[in-house]
Structure formats: C-alpha cells, structure tokens
Amino acid sequence: MRSDMNNTHPAIPRQAPANALNTSTIQPGAAPQQSMIRHIIAIDPDVDRSGVAFLHLPSRELHCEAKTFPELIDDLHATKQATDALGEPLIVIVEAGWLNRSNWHVQAGDSRRKAAAIGRAAGRNHEVGRKIVEMARHMGIETVEQRPLQKCWRGPDGKITAAELAQFTGYTRRTSQDMRDAALLAWVHAGLPIRI
C-alpha cells in the first residue's frame, strides 16, 4: 500500500450525506439495485496501464486515470474502505473482452505473425482483467464482468473520442483511449443519458 494514499479518492465526498444508504442488505453475488449504487469504478483492463473511471452518481462527478495493476489494486482497497466508512454502496465494472468469442482487431490482409501478436496482446489484457475481477471480489466489492460495448463512435475502430465523451459527461481533461472506454462503461452502467 502506498504511504501517500489516504482513505478517500477525489471522486468520493469526504462526509456521508444525511440520506446515505446502508449496504448490509446486499447479498454476496446478488446484483444491487440500480437506485442504491452511489459509486461506480469502471475499468478497461490493460497490461501496462488500465483505464479507470470513478463515477459518483449523486453528483455525476467523473474522474478518469490510467493505473498500473498494483496502483489499481491499492486504489480499489482504499476506495472500498472509504465507501464502507461512509456507508455507501460501491460497484466495480470490468470490461470483459474474454466473454466475446473474438475481440481481436485483425484485418483481412494482416500476416500470421501480426495476427499472433494481436492475439497474444488480447490474451494478456484478458488475464489482467480476470485478475482485477478476482482481486475486487476478494476484497468484498460487488463486481460485474461487462462485455465490451458496441463500437459506434467517430474515433478509429469505432471507439469514442474525447470530444464525444465531453459532450455528454462534461469531462474535458486529457484522456487516453482506455480511460475514455472506462468512462463510457461507467456512464452506460449507471444508465445516465448519452446525448450527442
């Protein structure tokens, strides 16, 4: 655990509101009711730096970061402690490309070597995602393995652009593609409107 880390995250309020909900009624493995969720952490797994989005639902405050695996696990632990102290529900959404039959981005003209490299990279990312899910569940955090969302945006390969994300979330800080994908995952899971 990093020594400079405190028990709160920028996307988590420091004091519990008067109407804070108690999570003691949520059964392990059962999906919590959408109205109860107050904090969503969405993760787009990557071998080097995963895209992570922290969404506080009551305020719609969104915070995006890129984290290495150890940093991410430390943040999950700290956020779990902070939300438990506030008595507020937390859920983690992990993009689970391994649930699709094929999530490779191979073009028709790619060589066998390139196709193998793409498959190897996808497999490594999938394993990171599985380990994130395993660690989050080990910490007692409600965790959802989410199939990748449909790619219907203006960016390369149908991925969401920074401008598109800013239009409906208001988040204008610099982001990587993994961070934007995580933010979109959190926003969609929360059922918040997407207007472009």
Model features per residue range: what roles?
Residues 2-196:
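Phosphate- and other anionic-substrate recognition elements at nucleic-acid/protein interfaces
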